[in-house]
Curated annotation (Swiss-Prot):
Gene3D superfamilies: 3.40.190.80, Fructose-1,6-Bisphosphatase, subunit A, domain 1. The gene is fbp. It catalyses: beta-D-fructose 1,6-bisphosphate + H2O = beta-D-fructose 6-phosphate + phosphate. Its cofactor is Mg(2+). This is Fructose-1,6-bisphosphatase class 1. Belongs to the FBPase class 1 family. Keywords: Carbohydrate metabolism, Cytoplasm, Hydrolase, Magnesium, Metal-binding. One of its GO terms (molecular function) is fructose 1,6-bisphosphate 1-phosphatase activity. Substrate binds at D106, G107, S108, S109, N196, K262. InterPro entries: FBPase_C_dom, FBPase_class-1, FBPase_N, FBPtase. It comes from the Bacteria. Transmembrane segments: none annotated. One of its GO terms (cellular component) is cytosol.
Length: 330
C-alpha cells in the first residue's frame, strides 16, 4: 500500500501544498491520540467559554484548535488560518502561500459518549496584500485541497486535491497513513438518508414534503423503502455517504429565526462539498451549488444537502418553482 507521502509525491500538486497536507495529517495523529486518551487525560467535558457561534466549548475543542494552530505556525507556508474556535482570522506568516480553514473537532458533543468525531479542513490560495477576513472569502471552487480525519475504530483521512477523493487509513503500528481507497465513488442512487428529525416542524415546506415522502417508503410516491441514519457529527455522516452512498442534509429551519442555518460554509460545507463532488456526488444549499457560493464572512452558515447525485437531484426538485417560497427566516 502507498503511504500518504508517496501518494502526494506522485500527484500533480506542488511540493509546498503536499507538505502542508502532511502537516495536517501528522497533527491529526496527535489529535487521534488525545481523543483516545479521553477521560484518562482529564480532557472530557466542557469549559466555561463560548466560541464565536455562542456554543459552549468542549475542552478538546480548545486543545485540538491549539494543536492545529501551533503545527501550522511552525510548518511554514501558511499565510493565515480561520477556525470554528477563533473569533477572527489568525495571521501566521507574511511569506505563506496558503490559507487554512478548519473545524478542529467536528461533533465534539459526541466526545463525552465516546462516539464519532473528526477534524475537517480546507486549503485556499492566499491572495497578495495584507491579510484580512476578505482574504478568505473565496468560493469553494477555489479550494486547493480539502479533507477530514475521522477518529473512530480506525483513524481515517479522506482527501481531495481536485483529482478525485482518496481514503487513507492510519496504521497504528507504523503511524503511517496508507492508501486504502484510491478513488472513492458515491453511488448515484440510495435508500438511506441522514437528517436531524427533531427539527421537522421548523423546516421549509419543500424539505418537509421530501422527508415525508421518504418516510412513506414503498407505499408513497418514491415506491421504495428508505432507512434513516444520524450520527450527530457531520464528519461521520458524510463518511458514510462517501463509503456507501446516501443523502445527508441539514436544511434551513425557523426554530431560531436569527440562526436559520446550522453548518458553517468555510470549514464544514465547502470542504465536504469538494470531497463529495470529487467522488461523483452533488452538494447544494437547496437553491445553489455549495461550491459556487461566495462567502460573506468566515463564520457564515448555510443549509446543506449532499450525497448521491440522483437523490440530491430528487430533493432539489422539491425546491423547484412549484414548491419554492422565499423563506421567512433570513
Amino acid at each position: 500500500m502507498q503511504t500518504l507521502a508517496q501518494t502526494l509525491a506522485s500527484s500533480k500538486i506542488n511540493d509546498s501544498l503536499a507538505q502542508l497536507i502532511l502537516t495536517l495529517a501528522d497533527t491529526s495523529k496527535d489529535i487521534s491520540l488525545a481523543v483516545r486518551h479521553g477521560a484518562l487525560a482529564g480532557v472530557l467535558g466542557a469549559t466555561e467559554q463560548e466560541n464565536v457561534q455562542g456554543e459552549t466549548q468542549k475542552k478538546l475543542d480548545v486543545i485540538t484548535n491549539d494543536m492545529l494552530k501551533d503545527a501550522l505556525t511552525a510548518a511554514g507556508g501558511v499565510r493565515g488560518l480561520a477556525s470554528e474556535e477563533e473569533d477572527f482570522v489568525v495571521e501566521v506568516s507574511e511569506q505563506g502561500e496558503f490559507l487554512v480553514c478548519f473545524d478542529p473537532l467536528d461533533g465534539s458533543s459526541n466526545i463525552d459518549i465516546n462516539s464519532l468525531v473528526g477534524t475537517i479542513f480546507s486549503v485556499l490560495p492566499a491572495p497578495t496584500g495584507p491579510l484580512t477576513e476578505q482574504s478568505f472569502l473565496q468560493s469553494g471552487r477555489k479550494q486547493l485541497a480539502a479533507g477530514y480525519v475521522l477518529y473512530g475504530p480506525s483513524t481515517m483521512l479522506a482527501l481531495t486535491t481536485g483529482q478525485g477523493t482518496q481514503l487513507f487509513t492510519l496504521n497504528p503500528d507504523t503511524q503511517e497513513f496508507l492508501l486504502t481507497d484510491a478513488a472513492m465513488a458515491i453511488s448515484p442512487d440510495t435508500g438511506e438518508f441522514a437528517i436531524n428529525m427533531s427539527n421537522q416542524r421548523f423546516w421549509e415546506a419543500p424539505m418537509q414534503t421530501y422527508i415525508a415522502d421518504l418516510l412513506l417508503g414503498d407505499i408513497g410516491p418514491r415506491e421504495k423503502p428508505f432507512n434513516m441514519r444520524w450520527i450527530a457529527a457531520m464528519v461521520g455522516d458524510v463518511h458514510r455517504v462517501l463509503s456507501r452512498g446516501g443523502i445527508f442534509t441539514y436544511p434551513a429551519d425557523n426554530k431560531n429565526p436569527n440562526k436559520p442555518y446550522k453548518l458553517r460554509l468555510m470549514y464544514e460545507a465547502n470542504p465536504m462539498a469538494f470531497l463529495v463532488e470529487q467522488a461523483g456526488g452533488k452538494a447544494s444549499n437547496g437553491y445553489e451549488t455549495i461550491l459556487d457560493i461566495t462567502p460573506s464572512e468566515i463564520h457564515q452558515r448555510v443549509a446543506v444537502i449532499l450525497g448521491s447525485a440522483n437523490e440530491v437531484d430528487t430533493c432539489l426538485s422539491y425546491h423547484g418553482i412549484d414548491y419554492r417560497e422565499e423563506p421567512n427566516i433570513d
